[in-house]
Design a protein with these regions (language model features):
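Active-site-proximal substrate-binding groove within the catalytic cores of carbohydrate-active enzymes
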Residues: 65-271, 287
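Active-site-adjacent "subsite" loops/lids of carbohydrate-active enzymes
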Residues: 1-28, 39, 102-118
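C-terminal beta-strand-rich structural cap/linker in extracellular carbohydrate-active enzymes
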Residues: 275-299
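Aromatic- and acidic-residue-enriched carbohydrate-binding clefts of CAZyme catalytic domains
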Residues: 1-12, 39-69
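Conserved beta-strand positions
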Residues: 30, 35-37, 82, 237
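Conserved structured core elements
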Residues: 11, 15-18, 32, 56-67, ...
């Protein structure tokens, strides 16, 4: 068995399962489907199931039934989150960016670095909006209090760090817990970060240029680019160390569409004009606070 113990989708049970799913969406008008665990089904050796002959055709027929449902959903305009990259070709809208669930039992500071590594590694071949990541607000698998964000107000810095790097990358996260805020202070932090994301949503959902992979030893960062927007670039830079750092960073601006000059501002401040070199790079000097971040807008 591939998945341990999956029921056969090409049985009468499976046929009824798909019929009920379609009926539910037709009658309720819901337009989002979260489907975790269908995939292609385990091989099934039954010779009495109504929708396959035996072992040899069992996975093929199960896959076909799944494809029919997904294609119908796509044609109907239903948005599908399915943790299987292979289903992107048959209608699903989003897949996991790539993470191991047990790693969310690590201490909070390691989860933050791990989250950025997952995003960095998972956005080479697809847009940030094609994947989701994970943020465990309560204990997940294990790790105890050291791995848990709850109570959110007591661990607000770590909570904000997760939100900033998730929204700042354009990769939406599944926040696993019972609430998004537990105090007025936490609520204001959530509202502030979401408002920041909405202000820059178009560029934050654009393609990513990878600047430096997170390693916990020095700065890391990514840059969104889109030559069709007023904000043609958006840079997220992080400092995982316990000390403030100042670095001169070369930004590859070719895919912003800029050719000679760029106007670059930090954290919404006054823009400065920077000349691009012959390879369309622009050098910027930035100071990143300890265990913190900064961001640049390029026009």
């Amino acid at each position: 068995m591939t998945f341990g113990s999956s029921p056969c989708l090409s049985s009468e049970w499976g046929h009824e399962y798909f019929r009920k799913i379609r009926s539910f969406f037709e009658k309720t008008g819901m337009d989002v489907f979260e489907h975790d665990g269908s995939y292609s089904g385990d091989p099934c050796a039954s010779t009495t199931h109504a929708f396959h002959k035996g072992l040899e055709d069992s996975q093929w027929t199960q896959r076909s039934m799944l494809e029919d449902t997904y294609k119908w959903m796509r044609a109907t305009g239903i948005y599908m989150n399915v943790p299987d990259m292979g289903t992107m070709l048959i209608g699903s809208s989003k897949c996991g960016v790539g993470y191991r669930e047990v790693n969310w039992s690590l201490p909070r500071d390691r989860q933050i670095i791990l989250g950025r590594q997952n995003i960095f590694d998972g956005t080479w071949k697809r847009n940030p909006g094609d994947g989701w990541t994970f943020t465990p607000l309560v204990q997940y698998h294990g790790g105890g209090a050291a791995a848990t964000l709850e109570p959110l107000d007591e661990h607000l810095d770590a909570y904000k760090a997760h939100m900033i790097q998730n929204y700042g990358s354009g990769v939406q996260s599944c926040y696993r817990g019972f609430r998004l805020y537990d105090t007025d202070r936490t609520k204001e932090a959530v509202k502030e970060i979401i408002a920041w994301y909405k202000e820059h949503r178009d560029i934050l959902n654009s393609d990513i240029i990878h600047l430096r992979r997170p390693d916990g030893r020095d700065w890391d960062g990514i840059m969104h680019v889109n030559p069709s927007l007023e904000e043609k670039g958006f840079v997220m830079l992080y400092n995982p160390t316990g000390e403030e750092i100042t670095r001169t960073i070369s930004l590859p601006l070719y895919y912003t569409g800029l050719t000679r000059m760029a106007r670059i501002s930090e954290r919404g401040g006054k823009a400065r004009r920077v000349r691009l070199d012959r390879e369309y790079n622009a050098e910027v000097k930035v100071t990143i606070p300890a265990d913190g971040y900064t961001w640049l807008v390029i026009k």
